[in-house]
């Protein structure tokens, strides 16, 4: 065999009959396997030694030649070659079939490949192959048509009429003849002409046929090879027969399937020799076809062949498919030697790079090393003796083991391994007992706890593997999370509590207010018990007295020397930022030292503090009753409104839920306030939550406040909350509601974990071949990034989005003009600070989305590697890291729901508009009318505001140094005050002088308003921070009259488009527009003037509640109808994970919106077939049609001006529309924002570039729109780079290039469409992928990771890249003379 490492490509083709014969070492003629008396293989049977090789090493079957010296000799008596028995793993046989048989992969799988080539439907093809119908092969001079199907009677009739002047036949022979007669070139040009004729109306079948024909032409496969005359028999060791204890045999299912084929084949051969009647022969041929089908794919047939125990037999295809198939079970994941597993316990005494391995386990794992050392030390002279010494566990063995494991790393892995930090290397330390000891700080990366978790240990054997473990996988080299660059090794629970206690301040304790000259004096005073840890003291640091506490001095004293004095109470968040800061300033070695000190101090002082909780620590606020009574009063008022018919049932429900949410929030705030004051902040429950050691505000609320609203099984919120808390105890009904929530949490967790795991698998599959391959792709494109804001609040600063990327443009300081950032320069933390000081908050950076590297991405576009904060190395497998970064939190989040126990988490909706800081109203957008109490927005609107960042009274100013509207930055002189001091700006913004005030204001911002908002301020007003400027109804969207006049109903017919319901609770009549669609009816309300002329009309969507009567007078601002918002549901990542799934799979959402295809003016047209036609007239007067389902709530009205991409009705956006209307860049931004939104809501931080890598893979293909002079087919989907290559070639030859449009493909589909057939086959739909690949003669270039793992090569990333493989180490021989 060819050396497994020296090929670079692998190809798959259909085997011809000659090829199968050339593989074979002989024909299998009998169906026997083993002679049950002698237990030797039968001659010419399925295990025959003459064909497949000897079963005994270097011995022939009859025993005439018995020794290695006869190697290669073929025995003259039994014809068996003297060889090694391992040849039985590689030698194949064959079966000569008595009648041709079609291969099930090519005729049965949809679309049927043979059917497409011959243009026969699958059902017709089946009836020919199973000998039910004849097909005309040559019609001769009859009036039959070629390829016409005839049944038995028709065939006999034609035979009588025309005699032998035509030929028709059935079975695989007929199909074989037809395939042999095909002229592919002629067929191809015929189909291409048809496609040109049909143009846009091309059906998919034409495209499929053309693709298959082109594939056959290019690959050199012949169509008739899909019909088999010879059947290969796989080597016997791969379908073994094993003797069990009771003398019975267990055999592979394949042997049974082969036996059936051989038996039927032999029977058919006899029947043919005997010239048996046609009907019998035909039946036998059909049975042969069936048995070969079962052999190749038993699960795909309607009648599955079953074995002895009535279970379906496992055929060749089944052996490849699925999780238990060859690919996933044996090639992508293997069980490995030198490994063990055990329960983990905490090892507080370990260093960060160590783990404790039980001595017994270590001895077993390192056995070969120990044996070698024993022999080297001449204690023993053979392996057998060494093994017995090890079994006796003599002292010498333990000494040797100690030496062996020194500096020999081991890998620890915890399942599920969701990201690369699930396997890390440690130096082993021998421990007593049987449990593995794990360092407490690495638990977070493993997501491990010590409640019975198990971990696996692996020993890297070769020096290269050990070196990689030390250099790359050691726990001390993996301090940062590759997903976002934040530390992943940080303290939690006990350690945090200990340090929080140590660094807290307490009033009136021993030693308060004392002064100390240095740290040593403080420590001495503590040891002498004359100073309390929590006492506030003054210590001299760098010649100055600093107010701090004794505990903080203890903490700082222990830290490594370089770190500046940390003077604050340390919570988990503070500790994480301290670790981050130290990492950036001092590097990893100091951090590692610091982490072990933090662990040690934390545990020590947690023990000293010895916190316990009792019932008296749970303090229920006395004001609870007041809050609950107030809520009940508000609810009575809401109920009253409902009874009067002012609000609908849905609004009532939403308002009630909102009241309880607010009450719960207020009560919680009060409770936390009380707990904080209790015992000077040393209330243990409060300390645990505040330090972040355990528990949360939400859990304390349930202990001491009220449990709050609960969710039903459906996810709806039950409007009656649980008012009790756990301290007071729950009533029976409250307890019952609680149990439901708790159970649901656990059930959901189990289901969603599988979901998130599957998401990770698909992500890995699509991105596995994205590797950093080159330094610079030379692109000039980039993406624009800016800080993400929610109104005025910065959700994600520019730093998070831009640090570690490379700039694509040169940025100069607007003041000095010097270059801050040059082209292709890395954006570092310092550069961002510089940009922020001069007021630049937008950047254009290089991104993976715009990278033009042909395979993978380039270093410059990827930027920084977050796992070490350095520029990414060439060879880094960034695709897999991206997939893990997105998949891992998915799984984490799904596991996190049950801790709160099903408590509903819907926020209370606010109905007031107030801004956090002072501002000036600069302008309004949107249709609004003047009413008594201000402005009323009849449709959606926008406020344009400028925030006031700084203000000063002009009277306090002596001399101004700036002009109105001038831009200022930090440090710029503003004015000289009355005392003659220069006042410098501490902000970035613009100067505004208004009403004797000097202000610095921000750039203009937009705040969107809902329809129905009442605004109490006017343009130009200055508004103080926190003032309520407007109100709206959060639970209903009103349709408001914009003119005065009379109401006239149009197409509002009771019983058809209008439904009157008597509300049983209130007795009121509610008028609701039905959501049924009627062809000719379009319910609207017209407003007419005194002369009866229509002024305007309002279209009423389905489910709108009418608020007016026909013929009544109406004023500007009156509500005509309103739409209730759906009731609140609790949202956790269950809402999140399916959403992420849908986005990555690019599924079209259920409740779709229609987007304006172009910018222009809206024109309403009639309803046709249940859809309303809306035209948008563009600037050239061209009409663009949009069809919208009639019941939908429209967001535009007749005559509105819209921009391309604006939503015309409510609903979800379809990503494919975004691509079509707004283009690729907008689509990337849309997907990125939507996916990040789901994760951000859950508090998960993932860097954009990871999601970018996946989106890039989803947009790899383009669809051919015009063929030009290329070989492409209209509507074909091709790889971008293949498209550019071919176009380049055509242009060079002076031809016309093809035109294509970008398309978006979901991750599953994209994984199956990948260039590597090995990778696609090992993902899903194995047989389909292999069928198509074999027809096309696909070549796998082995560029990705999966395909290399499957065939046993080193993966082409990191040290496995060709770039590094060619490195040679030479000794420098030029020594001095």
From Swiss-Prot:
This is DNA-directed RNA polymerase subunit beta'. The RNAP catalytic core consists of 2 alpha, 1 beta, 1 beta' and 1 omega subunit. When a sigma factor is associated with the core the holoenzyme is formed, which can initiate transcription. Keywords: DNA-directed RNA polymerase, Magnesium, Metal-binding, Nucleotidyltransferase, Transcription, Transferase, Zinc. InterPro entries: DNA-dir_RpoC_beta_prime, DNA-dir_RpoC_beta_prime_bact, RNA_pol_asu, RNA_pol_N, RNA_pol_Rpb1_1, RNA_pol_Rpb1_3, RNA_pol_Rpb1_3_sf, RNA_pol_Rpb1_4. GO terms for molecular function: DNA binding; DNA-directed RNA polymerase activity; magnesium ion binding; zinc ion binding. The keyword tRNA-binding does not apply. Zn(2+) 1 binds at residues 60, 62, 75, 78. It comes from Borrelia hermsii (strain HS1 / DAH). DNA-dependent RNA polymerase catalyzes the transcription of DNA into RNA using the four ribonucleoside triphosphates as substrates. Pfam families: RNA_pol_Rpb1_1, RNA_pol_Rpb1_2, RNA_pol_Rpb1_3, RNA_pol_Rpb1_4, RNA_pol_Rpb1_5. PANTHER family: DNA-DIRECTED RNA POLYMERASE (PTHR19376), DNA-DIRECTED RNA POLYMERASE SUBUNIT BETA (PTHR19376:SF54). Zn(2+) 2 binds at residues 777, 851, 858, 861. The lineage of its organism: Bacteria, Pseudomonadati, Spirochaetota, Spirochaetia, Spirochaetales. SUPFAM superfamilies: beta and beta-prime subunits of DNA dependent RNA-polymerase. Binds 1 Mg(2+) ion per subunit. Belongs to the RNA polymerase beta' chain family.
